[in-house]
Amino acid sequence: MKTLYIGNYKDRTGWGYASLNNILALHSAGVDVVPRAITFNNSHKDIHPIITELEQKSEKDCDACIYHTLPPLYSYNSKLKNIGFFVTETVTFTETMWQKHINMMDEVWVPNEQMIDACHKSGVRVPVKIAPHSLDISKYTNIEDCADATEFAGCFNFCFVGELINRKNIEGLLRAFHTEFHPSEPVNLMLKINRSGLSTDSTLQAFKNLSESVKSGLKIRTKYKNEIAIAGHLEDRHLLSLMSKCQCFVMPSFGEAWCIPALESMAIGIPVIYTGNTGMDDFCHGWKVESEAKPCYSATDSLDYMYTSHTKWMEPSIEHLASAMRVAYETYKNDRKKYDLICANAQSKAQNYSNRKVGRQLKELLHG
């Protein structure tokens, strides 16, 4: 089935990487896929050589079109099978009116079980099918040791990779880390952060302000351990090198449709601490943090009609997050055999999301 794939696969964002890997997954499964790029920012990465080749194909005589974009940008073509592909990180999305655009499609694909429930609660009437995201798993073996991380030596290193926005709940992560671990313990918190519209220096300053505010609010000691904060663009090989020197990935977000850095960590062999009752339930392996549905508040995402307090996201328990971080560290320190098994199981689970395996699933969905 010749398939037109519209997505922002050239953007250097999690959404862009998801679109890119889904195209590569379809191609690996033998689908005649024709990619066409749209963009939502000015941060573009080098084009994958396979994508460059696929872009030369004609859109003529396509049998299906996958719209991997915001539902308001969907356009129905009666000559094709029309498939919407979207994500959301909230319990419902009724207030966005996305369901009206989604219901124009023949079917919609989402990456996790939680989103199926959100679709049904939000008035989606067309078939909803799970289409997981994927990775080029070969990138995560024999990782080059090219990152200078002398601070990591002899320590248990927690890793966070994500945007410096409220939805990612970095404030909660800082509260949990500094409440649970004394500065004398050999434990680090490394954060690779970015913030759209801010320079590297401004991003680091914004993080410093947040960190100081958290420490001031905790009032439990006069001196705290410094976090290891890194901002700005890193080449993939440098970021993966940094991540490979860590022992546990942490994502305490209020909502995640997927979380590519978590899956990347698992592919390296690093377990994950993650917010439960989110899209991460579908694939993460490690320690699940209890959460409760709460009205969204102070979201900094770019669309003002999303993440309002008329809908809810999942707020993780800071106490349970701190406890999970302690368990991860103590398991590593006192029961290395158990820790190594958790790592091995995380890495094994990540193999289920290779481009090749997911490509076969997507091909079946296309023909379903």
How should each PLM-predicted stretch be described?
Residues 4-6, 37-122, 238:
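Extended catalytic core of nucleotide-activated donor transferases of GT-like folds
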Residues 241-257, 267-271:
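Acidic donor-binding loop of glycosyltransferase active sites
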Residues 200-240:
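Nucleotide-activated donor-binding/catalytic signature segment of Leloir-type glycosyltransferases, i.e.
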Residues 271-274, 288:
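Short hydrophobic beta-strand element within catalytic cores of glycosyltransferases
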Residues 320, 327, 337-352:
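A short, well-ordered alpha-helix in the C-terminal region of glycosyltransferases
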Residues 4, 150-168, 174-177, 189-191:
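Conserved donor-binding/catalytic core segment of Leloir-type glycosyltransferases
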Residues 1-64, 188, 356-360:
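N-terminal pre-catalytic "stem/leader" segment of glycosyltransferase-like enzymes
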